[in-house]
């Protein structure tokens, strides 16, 4: 043959389940956040709070802890029951915790900002993320609108990050981690500001159409 070719794998994907895992892990963490905010009181005794920051700290310490545990349980369960074999084991757990904390920061922000309307927005936002994250098929096969919104979807970076830790042994997650740390910081700051507003004026910033 006039041409010599060589084959080199850049990732290790053992089966379809491992290929789909990054997508469904992102969905699982997001749904866990939505379920938590539906059950956990986000405003109880806020009139007694000294400041928005202290009130946020009392709440955030709980929801971050809950999502950290949920992320660890998710990875552990997949490894035990579904034979998930991450190429970067420690980073898989760390990244899952960071993603969970970022998503709960985002979900609680929309919930306290918009109330019941926020819960509906969160559901719509999840559907948009499902289409725009390219979690199942290559982005090039998606419609133009999904290619446009792709860089702005949190699932885009969680799917990419989970793909790296599950299938690529020597790939950095610095970019994805910076994205989610940024989400945590921005959403937390906005949440503190909203709590400050609620302490001074006990009404939602956005009027509720369903009350």
In which residue ranges do the predicted regions lie?
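Membrane-spanning alpha-helical segments of multipass transporters and channels
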Residues: 4-211
